[in-house]
Amino acid sequence: MKYAKLGLLSGILLTFTFQSMAADWYVSLATGKNRNQGTREAPFKNIWKAIEKAAPGDTLHIAAGNYPGKMSCGWINMDKPVNLIGGYNADFSARDPLVYHTMLRPSNAQNTTKPIFGTLTIKTRKFGKNSNILIDGFIFDHTLANSYHPREGKPEGFEHGMLTIPPARGTTKYPSIDKALLNAETDGTFTIRNCLFLNGGNYAVLNGHFSGKVRIVNNVFIGNRMMGADVRSTNGKPGMVDFEFANNTLLFTWTRTKAFEDMGFGVRANANMSTNIHHNIIGLN
């Protein structure tokens, strides 16, 4: 009984800490420096630096720019539950994700240091059911990281042909990235909204969630491979995960292989979880 009470008290204190001690950090690729304090007036230069400084529950406000990752590796590792909010201008006086583009858009050359999992990799399962993550106002884009055939599958008027799958490659030095745009292992509440997922070399969003809610709302998925959004329960008990996929536009998902053998799905309702798919535009997957 004493141990049960102690565990309950610890959970309450953890929730209180996440909510009451949360801080705001600012990141601007154009005007920031990593030795800055991370304030609105003196922002960090890179997202990875802000994540290192942040505590669980903090919010990162991120100005326009194509963020290269640590040592320009081409991807971001998020190892604690924080909120990433993009779409600000350089001095954070205005926010409009349609105007101020906060991007994770790796190049083909960065495939030499490509991620194991995703261009945004989130591994926060250990923080438990009281954690919250929001990803808001980002452009995730593998167009430059992919390798397209110069002729095969080339529609009239287009610059390139079909996506090539490693080890094959087109005219680029390296094969396509073949990784997810966003790969996450999470718990608690996980929300993705107001984002663009473009030309993903693998899944656009691949999420294993242990308990709680996943909400993917008001996003655009265009030209990704495999699947637009695949959310799975990693909990052995049924009914522990609620997944909502709403008000998204999801078009032109490509198959796993050139021969159209499988995949090419928009969004999937997986086993042992509650899935609510509504008010979306889904076509040509």
What does each of the following model-derived ranges do?
Residues 1-8:
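Bacterial N-terminal signal peptides that target proteins for export
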Residues 86, 131-144, 159-171, 187-203, ...:
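Right-handed parallel beta-helix
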Residues 19-49, 64-66:
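Right-handed parallel beta-helix/beta-solenoid
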Residues 71-73, 94, 108-109, 114-116, ...:
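Short glycine/acidic-rich loop motifs that flank beta-strands on beta-rich extracellular proteins
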